[in-house]
UniProtKB/Swiss-Prot annotation:
Gene from which the chain derives: rpsC
Keyword list, A-Z: Ribonucleoprotein, Ribosomal protein, RNA-binding, rRNA-binding
rRNA-binding is among the record's keywords: yes
Transmembrane annotation, as ranges: none
Protein name: Small ribosomal subunit protein uS3
Length: 217
């Protein structure tokens, strides 16, 4: 019935990297729950800071958290006050030494999570769902996307029967594994209930690095 595999999960290990990099045996469940707690806490604390990806790397009694954000100044704060407070709270939450790296997202209009978040917030402010999607598509294409597809589903305009409506521009080759496709889904809380927002952005092909050949072979 036209179900789609998760575009990022399909490409992990091929052109995408893992968001969590660590190995564990007996502690696996504890680390996994700790990761979930860290992500939930950061998303709550930095809800307005346009945080997209949260990468977690573990060493012995040390956790390295990389935050990909479109607003690094808001995350860092005046003289680093915000990031210091966040680090202290994460140290307390995990009981381990937490290091925080801030990675700036140069083009937020090419990040599916941030685009979906923008559409969802507009829907909560009663912006027409068609207009919100079309504006997001225009911004992404202007920023250099090769293709973009969006979908909003739920009780659109307060209709009694829920439905899904989407728009697309350019190409979004979901079956091409070397295609760099970013995907995200968000939720908008409206007076009529929740609306689901899905975004696929095709940013071009990622070609594997050429291997060095000896003897001209």
């Amino acid at each position: 019935m036209g179900q789609k595999v998760h575009p990022i999960g399909l490409r992990v290990g091929i052109i995408r990297d893992w968001d969590a990099k660590w190995y564990a045996e007996k502690e696996y469940a504890d680390y996994l729950h700790e990761d979930l707690a860290i992500r939930k806490f950061i998303q709550k604390e930095l809800a307005d800071a346009s945080v997209s990806t949260i990468e977690i790397v573990r060493a012995v009694n040390k956790v390295i958290v990389s935050l990909h954000t479109a607003k690094p100044g808001m995350v860092i704060g005046k003289g680093g006050s915000n990031v210091d407070a966040l680090r202290a709270q994460l140290n307390k939450l995990t009981g381990k030494q937490v290091h925080i790296n801030i990675v700036e997202i140069k083009k937020p209009d090419l990040d599916a999570h941030l685009v979906g978040e923008t559409i969802a917030r507009q829907l909560e402010q009663r912006v027409a769902f068609r207009r919100a999607q079309k504006q997001a598509i225009q911004r992404a294409m202007r920023a250099g996307a090769k293709g973009i597809k969006t979908q909003v589903s739920g009780r659109l305009n307060g209709a009694d029967i829920a439905r899904a409506e989407g728009y697309s521009e350019g190409t979004v080759p979901l079956h091409t594994l070397r295609a760099d496709i970013d995907y995200a889904w968000e939720e908008a809380d409206t007076t009529y209930g929740k609306l689901g927002v899905k975004v696929w952005i095709y940013r071009g092909e990622v070609l594997p690095a050429r291997k060095n050949t000896k003897g001209g072979k």
